[in-house]
């Protein structure tokens, strides 16, 4: 993933040459140094945690202390002496939005970016497609079998079974999967433009309606999700993808399980909506509802 950022910066040096840059959540300062190497005049590297001290050491060791200014503090609290030409960050979490760093990225834009300035990355796209995987479904189901016992040292546990089942199926499955599990060659996308999206209207609640025609007769066990981000530079467009069709990344992919699988025949259609609602745990609640068109069959 780091290499993709380096490529995006180096292939768009015109966007960095003699420009003022903000790095949101700089961490150890790698992206700030990439911006300096691409010719930036000044880079404000902002980091809320104590790792900012490591970033300062790294910047000095690489001879860029005159260019890269490491500032420890939250974006909300930091004041800069000038507006900036480009904002860089690695704000993506699982399913793009987990950790809620996108809101900080967008807040920095509202606070410091010049009207004609750029966001790197520029857009993020969530992809969804129904999948079939009986093995993972059985695995989750079996994880609650402990609560099937009617005589656990004289105690009947079955009353707690449904709650345990609900909790097991409420957890997203984070990991890699084969694209052969997808039941459609098409996917539904939701694009977030970091240059225009607002913290409140665009990121607090994300609604993704969908409709899919099955390419094969199958059992739908849930919804598979992944994302990409694109860097729309003046000289080149660079994409970082977490797709199951692309090389693995540390963001993996996500799968959301239905409690009741849906049997579907080739050419039948399922439709519904996936809703992501921001919560106080720096993440999102995800609600998924799916219906087999032309029937009363539905699941969530």
Residue ranges and their predicted role:
Residues 1-24, 28-300:
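Class I SAM-binding transferase module
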